[in-house]
Amino acid sequence: LKLKDILGKIKVILSHLNK
């Protein structure tokens, strides 16, 4: 996995947790 892909997944997970 590329760093960009990992960061993208992290952002998605954080966005779901913030809801």
Curated annotation (Swiss-Prot):
Keywords: Antibiotic, Antimicrobial, Fungicide, G-protein coupled receptor impairing toxin, Immunity, Innate immunity, Mast cell degranulation, Secreted, Toxin. GO terms for cellular component: extracellular region. It comes from the Eukaryota. GO terms for molecular function: toxin activity. It is found in: Secreted. GO terms for biological process: defense response to bacterium; defense response to fungus; innate immune response; killing of cells of another organism. Expressed by the venom gland. The keyword Secreted applies. Belongs to the MCD family. Bombolitin subfamily. Mast cell degranulating peptide. May also display antibacterial and antifungal activities. Its mast cell degranulation activity may be related to the activation of G-protein coupled receptors in mast cells as well as interaction with other proteins located in cell endosomal membranes in the mast cells. This is Bombolitin-7.
